[in-house]
């Protein structure tokens, strides 16, 4: 008897985004990222629950959940072009969702969204009208707070908590059906030169500590060519989480240069 795993891609769905633009991530200028659904939107969260219920009803052993988070400015359909050099800070601010539901999520915590919207918009206007002042600087929460103010950190915390609640609701469905809940973690792709992927997960709205308490298994995308880089990332997850871990490697170019290279990474 075969054990069947369902690989579900949740928030990266252009067909739904184009048919329902109100469900798409919407930045501070009102630009819609139609390839990306906003997980804060209750209708989108409901869709994620419905998709999960449908899959667990089919006698599967596990759900491998991909794209259950935000993605960033460059993910898109992989055809997007900016034609100017943008820092990681600018890309991050440009991709932040301020759809009505993200605004409500922030204001439900007792905060006024207007100052935050103004600061983000003004900061990005400097880039587009003059030059990106953050080129060469690493994206950190500390730098964001310096640029925008502490409100940005509150915003990020609120969205992490809301996304964690979506995971909790999905987990209730999988547990009731006796289905394993696996999370495809794209954090290693945020900074291809970093061995500490977990420290970058906040950039896509994921609080690893919260998710660690909900899911059954992390499946990080460890797309690296060097054997040591693979080992370092695996160590990062082994030390930073206590859920199960199944690394996803890419057996083709450019990650694997030879059969021996792949064998060494697996072993």
Briefly describe each language-model feature range.
Residues 71-118, 247:
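Short acidic, glycine/proline-enriched helix-loop-strand junctions
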Residues 60, 208-233, 241-267:
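Substrate-binding cleft of secreted/luminal carbohydrate-active enzymes
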Residues 132-151, 199-229:
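Aromatic- and acid-rich polysaccharide-binding/catalytic face
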Residues 1, 31-46, 150-162, 218-224, ...:
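The substrate-binding groove and active-site-proximal loops of carbohydrate-active enzymes
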Residues 3-11, 64-68, 102-131, 154-200, ...:
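Aromatic-lined carbohydrate-recognition surfaces of secreted/lumenal glycan-active proteins
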Residues 1, 52-53, 163-172, 208, ...:
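Generic structural signal for well-ordered alpha-helices
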Residues 26-33, 37-40, 48-77, 134, ...:
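Active-site groove signature of glycoside hydrolases
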